[in-house]
């Protein structure tokens, strides 16, 4: 059995967001202008039934780590977010929930309620990439006053908060001030993250394209810039070592968010869609199967067996140990 137990779950709850971060997978660049990704099912949200199907599975460890990420959406934009938290704790009271948010949605009352629901091992990570004058350079459209109000409300109600800041050229001189501001609100941890696109042509490209942002327009579907790769050192099989799975906004189970991103990325999708789906596109769908049936599928053995010999391009780009 490849997964005798499940220790960590990433939930991508929706394809809904209040922000227009130019480096996000929600968007794509065409002729130096930014558009909506034409392959994403915008405004989709995972159902409560899917969350139940995941949490009731007996493979989950007692203190399972639940990571509510935002590959293509803002987790708290899910209309039934607090109900999702209740479902998690109903099945696993000791679950460690980690919520990612830009902090610019909902009300202070919502964050107070959330603080009271979360146990002592659970956290919210506020993604704040600057001060009032610089946060909007990347977190385009996020209301600064909302971030401040919601952070204060959550911390004042006893919640555990982290502020995470991606280091950009326009905010690197502010890091100490950002940390001091966060701590003044009651934030317990401040973390910086290296910008993975720093000093790359890709960053130059999206910085320029963000000046011509078509926030409501779907991009035309163009040619495929395939990124297939065969050169690799050794693949670190993170999903198996960490006993982790990923559940997307349509209720499909995958090894990680990188696999999900590949399905709607022109650089990978022509390779990855047949690699994942093969002859049955619903084998990993929780709309059609229990989580137990999904985890017993032979596909996981195929993936594991390929890591040392013929890994897919996503595994090479994300988990090659030489990187």
Give the ranges of each region predicted by the language model.
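Catalytic phosphate/metal-binding cores of nucleic-acid and nucleotide-processing enzymes, i.e., regions
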Residues: 99, 104
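Acidic donor-diphosphate engagement hotspot in glycosyltransferases and nucleotidyltransferases
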Residues: 80-81, 110
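Radical SAM enzyme [4Fe-4S]-AdoMet core and its adjacent flexible, acidic
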Residues: 4, 8, 12, 27-52, ...
């Amino acid at each position: 059995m490849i997964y005798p137990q499940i220790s960590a779950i990433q939930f991508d709850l929706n394809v809904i967001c209040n922000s227009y971060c130019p480096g996000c997978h929600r968007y794509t660049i065409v002729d130096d202008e930014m558009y909506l990704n034409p392959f994403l099912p915008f405004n989709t949200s995972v159902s409560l039934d899917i969350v139940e199907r995941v949490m009731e599975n007996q493979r989950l460890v007692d203190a399972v780590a639940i990571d509510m990420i935002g590959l293509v959406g803002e987790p708290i934009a899910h209309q039934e977010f607090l109900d999702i938290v209740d479902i998690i704790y109903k099945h696993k009271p000791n679950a460690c929930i980690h919520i990612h948010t830009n902090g610019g949605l909902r009300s202070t009352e919502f964050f107070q309620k959330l603080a009271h629901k979360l146990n002592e091992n659970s956290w919210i990570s506020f993604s704040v990439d600057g001060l009032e004058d610089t946060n909007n350079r990347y977190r385009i459209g996020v209301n600064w006053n909302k971030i401040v109000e919601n952070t204060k409300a959550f911390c004042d109600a006893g919640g555990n908060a982290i502020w995470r800041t991606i280091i950009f050229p326009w905010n690197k001189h502010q890091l100490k001030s950002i940390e001091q501001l966060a701590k003044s609100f009651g934030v317990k941890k401040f973390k910086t993250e290296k910008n993975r696109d720093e000093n790359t042509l890709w960053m130059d490209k999206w910085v320029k394209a963000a000046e011509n942002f078509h926030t409501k327009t779907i991009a035309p579907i163009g040619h495929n810039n395939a990124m297939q790769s065969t050169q690799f050192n050794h693949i670190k099989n993170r999903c198996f070592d960490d006993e982790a799975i990923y559940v997307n906004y349509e209720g499909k189970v995958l090894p990680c968010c990188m696999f999900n991103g590949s399905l709607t990325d022109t650089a990978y999708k022509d390779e990855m869609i047949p690699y994942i789906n093969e002859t049955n596109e619903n084998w990993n769908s929780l709309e059609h199967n229990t989580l137990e049936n999904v985890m017993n599928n032979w596909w996981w053995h195929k993936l594991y067996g390929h890591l040392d010999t013929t890994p897919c391009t996503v595994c090479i780009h994300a988990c090659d140990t030489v990187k």
